[in-house]
């Protein structure tokens, strides 16, 4: 197993460095079950990325002219209710918010009422029966810690689309972190993100190469 460790300044740099690492070190993965079954992707064995200043704007990466943007802030703002509230649109099997909404409130309460030094402020996504869904949640947990009066997040994805998912996911989670920090009364902190399934689908390989080599 090859563990890839990436140090990044902000969300944009994290995305660019992860694209480069996945293109160079990712192995050929033929999908036998799940999204895009029968197709290929490049995937890292396991990766950990430490993002020092995830709140740096813009939260969404800039791409070369002619390359479709992986996300927009308008999309991220529309994504926030999916991340933070239990409301489900018609046809949705789940939202992250249905699992996180009450936990967000409890983590804020916990830190304010009981103090900052606890390892119990962990937010879980999913439940045992989620394994039977057609597409189980990719985000599985957000751990939190307050150190030096800053709220840090530790985020795990079981599978993670680097092109179409990573920028929107982390921009939305960063906005969630800023909201929680404000409610708790501390400063916004750092991020550590990890996955054993960070990947780029074959249809994005050429686009990713343009971005990395610009």
Predicted regions and their residues:
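Terminal, non-catalytic protein-protein interaction segments that mediate quaternary/complex assembly
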Residues: 1-214
